[in-house]
Amino acid sequence: EETDTLTVKCQVVSVDSRRLTAVYTGSLSAQGAVHPTELFYTNTLDLTLVEDIGLADYGDALTMAAYVKSEDVSFYDLAADRLSAVTEYIATVDEDTLTSIFESADFPLGEDGAWPESFSYERQGTIYLSMPVPHALGDYVIVSFVPETK
């Protein structure tokens, strides 16, 4: 809509001769909406092959889903006042649903052109993975996972 407002900021969080990772955050204020929708997406490019790199290249969806459902889950930059509500919400989502979301994470878009529900990137050995949550909980949370410690 012409009256909607989209704001997106890009931060290059990692770059070297082989790989570039950009994180995009922002919001969409739709006409008539009480609160804006918060946005998060990432893109990691293999600069040698000029191809997208995603969760399937440095982690696996089933492991990440099990981690999100575990008591060990760690969130990146989640306000303390939201932690309890997010944890309660995650308890209502089954592991198969999370696995499916994480299997479709990252670019490129799926065959049907659908925008992924989850985005990820790897930085200094830590995997960061977004997970959709209800609008009242902030639209998404970021899970941080360090494979060596799991």
Give the location of each predicted region:
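Compositionally biased intrinsically disordered regions enriched in Thr/Gly
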Residues: E1-K150
